[in-house]
Amino acid sequence: MKAILIDVKNQLVKEVEHDDTLDNIYELIDCRTFDVVSIDGKNSIYVDDEGLYREDQLYFEYFGTEHSVRLAGNGLILGLDRDSGDSISTTLTTEEVKNKVVFLPDGFSINPSMEVTEWV
């Protein structure tokens, strides 16, 4: 199926073929675990779930229709079949994604944090 890879190391956005396996996602985005960020209700970006903890990590910002999000490491855009929950070919074009991605400069970082709030 058609997917779009956001390659932070080479600062490229390109179409790739996804074989609908978890191993292929791990390989394409170079990770051990992943998280999924919905970007428009029809497409999602798969990213390294441990990306914030990698040293010398590179980042990109995706400017969606309503908001932007800064993400660590490579991203893989796949479509979503809302009825079944399955991944499908993305509905976006490479050009559309190129126009929505900005690669952040070397040295940019996000410090992961967690805050516990007492409920009263």
Model-inferred region functions:
Residues 1-120:
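Domain-length accessory/inserted modules outside core catalytic folds
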